[in-house]
Amino acid sequence: MEVLHSNTARTPVRAVLFDFDGTVSTLRCGWEAVMKPLMLEMISGGKGWDAALENEVEEYIGESTGIQTIHQMKWLAARVHEGGSNPEAPTDPWWYKGEYNRRLMEQVSKRVESLTAGQVPNTAYLIAGSEDFLQTLCGRGVKLYVASGTDHPDVCHEAAALGVDKYFTLIAGAPVGEENCSKEKVMAQLLEAEGLHGDEVAVIGDGKGEICLGCEAGARTIGLATNEREGGVDAVKRERLIKAGADVIAGDFSEKEALLAFLGL
């Protein structure tokens, strides 16, 4: 665990807001490798692309990690027609969202099926130490929430397949067919409806969006720079999360006691 902003003693957190994909679950590991070729194909019209376009797409995907998928597809739809190489391409961002989801779910569905059939343990698709960490937080009376840019039914289904849905007071994914961000709504609920102060809330995620949101609310922030394939800290994610203002960087939840101490627990 890397502490970036050392703080004086704080009160124990009462609620933790988690991102899901890449923070708790690895069921969607490799989503970038699905989104990138889709974007390149659509922007170029299948005519090939240069290194500059590839770098642009990679940079956008990295910077947009954690936001609602439809907003990524709105960027794609605009970029397709801005480039002019694919004038016959659809203009509707929801078309791109549907095509991306179709491609992605080809691999995600197989992983979920292997879980539900008992062919692999849930640890095969959980970030290291995540379930133990969730259990410990619940055992200490902390309320846990999920807010994800992935479609709400899919987040709920995948959390259940992993057996971690029972730890969360609320799981909020993106409303199907709507452009509403669940992360801002859940944070507002914690601060307003639950009557919590920012320092009583922590935000844990691998995207800059949720870390920025946590910083704005005065919450404690743990940037999870997960290397989903190999374990440890992903250097690119680390830099992005540092720029977003994360208080702490970790590669997973294996340093449980240090993370709990940071949360005042």
PLM regions and their residue ranges:
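Short, acidic loop-to-helix structural element flanking the phosphoryl-transfer center
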Residues: H5-S6, P12, L17, S109-V146, ...
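Short acidic-hydrophobic, aromatic-tinged amphipathic segments that line or gate anion-handling sites
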Residues: D247-E255
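Active-site neighborhood of HAD-like aspartate-dependent phosphohydrolases
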Residues: M1-N55
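Conserved Lys-Pro-Asp/Glu-containing loop-to-beta segment of HAD-superfamily phosphomonoesterases
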Residues: C181-G214
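Acidic, Mg2+-coordinating phosphoryl-transfer loop and its flanking beta/alpha structural elements
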Residues: V203-V248
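Conserved phosphoryl-transfer catalytic core
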Residues: E32-G84, R111-S114
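Substrate-recognition/cap helix-loop segment adjacent to the acidic, metal-dependent catalytic center
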Residues: P121, E131-Y145, G149-P175, E192, ...
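Metal-dependent phosphoesterase signature
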Residues: E2, A78-D132
